[in-house]
Amino acid sequence: MKFQFVTALALASTMAVAAPINDQQEVLGAVAATRSKREGGSTGAELQDNNQPTAGLFGDGNSFGNQGLGGFLAATVDSLTKTIASPIKGILAPGGGSGGNGGSGGSGAAGGVGNLFSGILGGL
């Protein structure tokens, strides 16, 4: 007798829990009025529009398309890092570049000065 009661109770609770699932899907469909762009199939132009770079205070920043204050701050840090790193890369870069090679003997001092100026001017 006890086994039958437990079985009947388990069956009843399963039916009670399973019944609202179909109703929940209808409710969720009514509640979720907004649709994701990807849900209906996006065009390439929409995806590109979502992926525009965020400009920072010092020019181009990150390329993730973050918007709002957080995105602006991230882009500003990124653009500041690029602004500082550009002249340093120019100074440390090997080779003559615009400073000349000093003939066939290698870069020499003239090449280093050329890297210095091209690095500084390239960062501006």
Swiss-Prot record:
Protein's cellular compartments: Cell membrane
Chain spans, region Disordered: 38-59
Keyword Cytoplasm: no
Annotated signal peptide: 1-18
UniProt keyword terms in alphabetical order: Cell membrane, Glycoprotein, GPI-anchor, Lipoprotein, Membrane, Signal
Lipid positions (GPI-anchor amidated serine): 107
Membrane topology designation: Lipid-anchor; GPI-anchor
Statement: the UniProt record of this protein carries the keyword Metal-binding: no
GO cellular component: plasma membrane; side of membrane
Induction: Up-regulated upon milbemycins A3 oxim derivative (A3Ox) treatment.
Prosegment residue ranges: 108-124
Protein name: Predicted GPI-anchored protein 11
The organism of origin for this protein: Candida albicans (strain SC5314 / ATCC MYA-2876)
